[in-house]
A protein has these predicted regions:
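Second-shell loop/turn segments in exported
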Residues: 75-87, 132-138, 267-274, 283-284, ...
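N-terminal regions that are enriched for targeting/export leaders
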Residues: 21-79
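Alpha-helical support elements that line or immediately flank enzyme active sites
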Residues: 86, 90-102, 106
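An N-terminal structural lobe/cap that precedes and organizes the functional/catalytic core
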Residues: 67-83, 108-117
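Structural recognition of the beta-strand scaffold that forms the well-ordered cores
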Residues: 91, 116-119, 147-150, 158-161, ...
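Active-site signature of cysteine proteases
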Residues: 21-23, 198, 202-406
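Papain-like cysteine protease catalytic cores
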Residues: 114-222
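Bacterial Sec-dependent N-terminal signal peptides
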Residues: 1-22
Length: 406
């Protein structure tokens, strides 16, 4: 009996831990996005007729998470804004972060134009399409650091000076109009081998001008006229070079600047600081606690990602236990395609519950507007660990990470 005593004691000690483990339930439901439906109805978009399909997802009624935005300790940020039917999340999330940065650094409130950045990103995509003779990826999306790249070249504008919405429009609709027309035109350029950059760029700009309006060359603020470059330098006073991108993928060497291997990184930026998962999470935890907000990007296709009233993102216990979320688990999902670079978001707050962080996420996509906290998601720390691939933040918030690099 004595030789079994240590084993019995271990089992007794483990029983309370076992009892405390969260055991989630699954349900099969038709995923509905009420806000997206209302946008499509407003835009008179016809949906293809198909029978509703029930999908396996988490029963969020069993999840004990934050109940309200007010529970979070948050940094200053402007209210959420809808991106409509478009792939502009990369710009909405990063612009939101930079608006928060302006306030953090100077206390000023400046609402910036996302569509001005998007306009010039389309132009740069067209240039690259010509340069590579049609081999570059052409899609609606991009990455967070595209905002920094565009600002350095073209500057920026206040939101009131350039909305990208024609008179009477309420929602952006690039999926049915702007993007298909540009994409079709570039396909015709490739088919005809008509690689005249000046012609291609001027045609793409004509399409952009038709749907978004031409961006102003000069803006007047408080009685002073500025070009977009002057507005960035003299009014906004944000240095795009002060922001860094962190990545955590074990397929790339640790502690090196690497390329983020996803289609939306169409210009093959290799400016991502690749670090192990624990350091990636430590950087996020440290930054938000020091008052820095963070742009994050990753996957939103999971059964633990609510499209409805819950407004949460968690990793169900029947997916993977929290203790097993590590570098290998992340990489496995990225390698097999179940984690993708779906969406860009703005992390603006945190609250600690039961020893784990919940993050307040400002979101521009329609599904964030179906809950009791419209425009926001509540992300559990484990969801960020498993499914968020990269993030952007001020370099001062990442000093400890950057010190590991040569």
């Amino acid at each position: 009996m004595q030789r079994f005593l240590p084993l019995i004691l271990i089992l007794i000690l483990l029983l309370p831990l076992r009892a405390q483990e969260r055991r989630d339930r699954a349900v099969f439901e038709v995923r509905r996005d009420a806000m997206l439906d209302s946008i499509e109805t407003f835009l008179q978009k016809e949906k293809p007729a198909r029978a509703p399909r029930k999908l396996m997802q988490l029963d969020f009624s069993t999840v004990q998470g934050p109940a309200a935005v007010s529970e979070f300790k948050s940094v200053w940020h402007l209210p959420p804004a809808l991106q409509g039917l478009s792939g502009m999340c990369w710009c909405f999330s990063t612009t939101s972060m930079l608006e928060s940065e302006i306030h953090r650094q100077s206390g000023r409130v400046i609402d910036l134009s996302e569509l001005y950045t998007v306009y010039w990103e389309h132009v740069e995509k067209a240039r690259e399409f010509v340069r590579t003779r049609g081999r570059s990826f052409h899609g609606e999306g991009s990455e967070s650091n595209a905002v920094f790249r565009i600002w350095k070249k073209y500057g920026c504008l206040p939101a009131a000076a350039y909305t990208g919405l024609k008179s009477g429009a309420t929602f952006h609709d690039h999926e049915n109009t702007l993007f298909p027309e540009i994409h079709s035109y570039l396909a015709s350029v490739k088919a005809a081998n008509a690689w005249n950059e000046e012609t291609v760029v001027s045609t793409v700009r004509a399409i952009l001008d038709h749907y978004l309006g031409a961006p102003p060359a000069v803006v007047t603020v408080d009685g002073v006229k500025y070009t977009p470059q002057e507005y960035l330098a003299r009014v906004v006073r944000i240095d795009p070079d002060d922001y860094v991108d962190l990545l955590s993928l074990m397929e790339k060497p640790w502690y090196e600047k690497v390329e983020f291997p996803v289609p939306d990184n169409w210009w093959h930026s290799a400016d991502y600081y690749n670090i192990p998962l624990d350091e990636f999470m430590a950087a996020i935890k440290s930054a938000i606690r020091k008052g820095y907000s963070i742009e994050i990007g990753g996957d939103m296709s999971e059964p633990g990602y609510s499209r409805g009233a819950a407004g949460m993102a968690v990793v169900p216990s029947w997916d993977i236990p929290a203790a097993f979320i590590d570098d290998e688990a992340r990489q496995f999902r990225f390698s097999n395609g179940t984690t993708a670079d779906d969406h860009g978001l703005h992390l603006v707050g945190y609250v600690e519950k039961d020893g784990k962080d919940w993050y307040l996420i400002k979101d521009s996509w329609s599904s964030a507007y179906n809950s009791s906290h419209p425009g926001y998601y509540f992300f559990h720390e484990d969801y960020v660990r498993l499914k968020m691939l990269c993030c952007s933040m001020h370099k001062d918030a990442a000093k400890e990470v950057l010190a590991r690099f040569k």
